[in-house]
């Protein structure tokens, strides 16, 4: 296959992005220039060309790749590498049938404890991670021999192997998985030392290790794809014994395909930002003189969390809802009076374009009408998607979160004494993840029954994701207050210092809360990775990516209040 590149400078047209089933038109790898033009790279590679070539690499010459395909065991390591590459570059969705077939065969070999899996540390760790994430029952005890560095060093220590052990250990879903805890502990120390000592000669590999160590749980699919496009190097897998299935696939094949896919996503993202800004102005939200301006960061987080470019409307719905939740939170938290907050809740419960009573202020009218019109629009779109009305359900979710905001306001205003456990049991409802996640699920191509939406599984998944967000936000706020020398502590931190009638330091309280974050994160993974489930995996993945987005937003710094890392990342999202 030839790759013919034609380079020219063309203004970004903003035209509709074509289907991935079409031959790629002139797709841009945009490079910022003073006149705001973009460098366009025209490639003759087609989606079908590359996918056909990839699918050929997944099978033997005499295979038709039927459902019952049994692959040669010696092919598994290289096929796992291909799967990992496709996932890292964010294009695995185009090869799910082939990936599932390979993982079925890998699981069979895992159960047999076949030497092709168990005879190589890197293959063993990668197989564990890929199988667990897909919901296969694999015991972490099989990785117990790698629980200390000395044991691994005797098997020829190399950096990619340790990275794979680190990634596998991050898939710990049960408290009792001590072997993964041990692996994560020593690999983290080892990799940190390698970075600090500047001991990694390969610059790309050095940056990859830095990226993983900075905030591993906060790596969404799209964020990971962007970084791996920059740092991609097939020699990363050279330690694996393979049948050279990559021989007729050069790095450019992978990169051109993945960059074209990413470029489609980013073109849609830019269009989505324009639509979001127009909506924000049309709702007159730009005239309000309080609260955080989160339009850009909300659009960016939506693009990180909703990665499939077929879901451009879903990203817009997600971003609009995130903006509204933030504005309402700010209104209840620091601007509106208790009476005004009660009024907003009454208006939402009534849900009329022309309410029976007066608004009382222009701000209340702007807030309610923005919410009213937006929810009605989203509900109508969801009705088409679901084949039934979900407006009442969405309005109830808004009443729920606004009522939770009011309870928190009253608790603070009235000086109500609350224990840490009381706070934890109710505070998750004031986190926007449940509302935003349940709304987003309406648009991902799955018909949702009341049984599914009201199920214990759905409630638990939303609750655990919300708790991750609530607790991370509180810890982040506490750290910011400490750095800025602001009096007072984040509420949960304050309560945690006096938990169970004992007095502990703020640092001890934060450590305990971080342990709680890990607990709820593991619960999220348990529910998402479980195969026997009332919710389809596509729906659960919405909440999984939201949880990752929460780690991204609050894992290091409060990116909604004072964006730092996100600003740098947004710049880097332009090739």
Curated annotation (Swiss-Prot):
UniProt: Mg(2+) 3 binding residues: 473, 477, 481
Reactions it catalyzes: 8-hydroxycopalyl diphosphate + H2O = sclareol + diphosphate
GO cellular component, one term: chloroplast
Family matches, as InterPro entries: Isoprenoid_synthase_dom_sf (IPR008949), Terpene_synth_N (IPR001906), Terpene_synth_N_sf (IPR036965), Terpene_synthase-like (IPR050148), Terpene_synthase_metal-bd (IPR005630), Terpenoid_cyclase/PrenylTrfase (IPR008930)
UniProt entry keywords in alphabetical sequence: Chloroplast, Lyase, Magnesium, Metal-binding, Plastid, Transit peptide
Recorded metabolic or biological pathway in which this protein acts: Secondary metabolite biosynthesis; terpenoid biosynthesis
Residue sites binding Mg(2+) 2 per the record: 329, 333
Positions bound to Mg(2+) 1: 329, 333
Use of this protein: Escherichia coli expressing SsLPS and SsSCS from Salvia sclarea and CrtE from Pantoea agglomerans can produce sclareol in high-cell-density fermentation conditions, thus being an alternative, sustainable, and cost-efficient route to sclareol and other diterpene analogs.
Annotated transit peptide: 1-51
Protein name: Sclareol synthase, chloroplastic
Native species: Salvia sclarea (Clary sage)
Classification lineage: Eukaryota, Viridiplantae, Streptophyta, Embryophyta, Tracheophyta
